[in-house]
Amino acid sequence: MDSYEKEESVASTSGIQDLQTLSELVGPENAGEGELTIAEEPEENPRRPRRYTKREVKCVSYHAYKEIEDKHPQHIKLQDWIPTPEEMSKSLCKRLILCGLYSAEKASEILRMPFTVSWEQSDTDPDCFIVSYTCIFCDAVIHDPMPIRWDPEVGIWVKYKPLRGIVGSAVFIMHKHQRNCSLVKPSTSCSEGPKPRPRHDPVLRCDMFEKHHKPRQKRPRRRSIDNESCASSSDTMANEPGSLCTNPLWNPGPLLSGLLEESSNLPNLEVHMSGGPFWEEVYGDSILGPPSGSGEHSVL
C-alpha cells in the first residue's frame, strides 16, 4: 500500500474514532437497549397567558366551529372570528372586512398584494377588531389604523369611527414595504416572528382623534372680479316684472319691430320669445313690460 493510500484511510476513520457511542449520545433507552421514548417538549412560560388562536385548530365544517366556540366562548373571538360561519367562509369574511374599511377598488388592491389578512379582537373594546397584514416573504406585520366591528342588526362590517381621512390608511405603508421588502424570512431560532412597530391602540387613537380633532373651517367663496351684484333673490331687478335687459338696443321688442316693421305677428312672437303666455301670466315676466292682464294669477 502506498503512503498516499495509508494517509487517506487514516483520515477517513479518524472522525469515527472520536465519536461517542450511540448510547452515550441519546441514552440507552433511545439507542435500542430499551423502549423508544420521545423527549417531551419544554413547557411554555407559565407567566405568559396562552392565547387560543384558529391556527391551532383545523375547522373543517360549521359544526366543528360551533363545537370550538362552545368549549372556548371567551377565546373564540381573539383571531379570525367569523360572525356567521354557516353563511360565510373565512375568505368571504376577509373580503367583507376589507370592503368595510376601504372602497372596493382599494380592497381589490390589498388582495393583490403579497399579504395575508387577519383580524384580532381588541383588548380595549371587545366589540372591535384590529386588522393586520402579514408579508408572505419576510413575515413583517402592518396594523390597520382603523378598527372594525360587526353590526349584527344589518349584518355587515363597519368602521369604528368615520375618521378615515384623519387616522390614515395602511395601503400606502403596504406599497412602501412591498418596494423595500428584503424577501428574507426571519431566523428559525426565534420562536416568534418579527414584532410590529409599537404604536398606540387603534381604538384609543380613534377616540383621541374624535375628542380633540377640530374640523377645518371652510374657505370663503371667491367673489366676482367686477364686484357687481348678480341677479338673485336679493337683487331688486330680479323681482321687478318685465325684461331683465336694461339696454334698449338689445331689447327684443325694438329689434323685432326694426326687422319685421309693422307685422301682425309681432306681439305673438314677443310673447313666445319671453317664455309663452303661461310664463307671462304666472310670473309676470315679459319683454313687453308689466303684464297686461288682471294679475289675479300673478305671483310677483
UniProtKB/Swiss-Prot annotation:
It comes from Human spumaretrovirus (SFVcpz(hu)). Its main location: host cell. GO terms for molecular function: DNA binding. It is found in: Host nucleus. GO terms for biological process: positive regulation of DNA-templated transcription; viral process. Homodimer or homomultimer. Forms complexes with the host nuclear factors NFIA, NFIB, NFIC or NFIX. InterPro entries: Foamy_BEL. Residues 224-300 are annotated as: Transactivation domain. This is Protein Bel-1. Residues 1-50, 209-244 are annotated as: Disordered. Keywords: Activator, DNA-binding, Host nucleus, Transcription, Transcription regulation. Residues 89-200 bind DNA. GO terms for cellular component: host cell nucleus. Residues 211-222 have a biased composition (Basic residues). Pfam families: Foamy_BEL. It comes from the Viruses. Transcriptional transactivator that activates the viral internal promoter (IP), thereby enhancing its own expression. This transactivation is repressed by nuclear factor I. Also transactivates the long terminal repeat (LTR) promoter, thereby inducing structural gene expression, initiating the late phase of infection. It is therefore a key regulator of viral gene expression. It directly binds to and activates DNA target sites of viral promoters and those of distinct cellular genes. Required for viral replication. A motif (Nuclear localization signal) lies at residues 214-223.
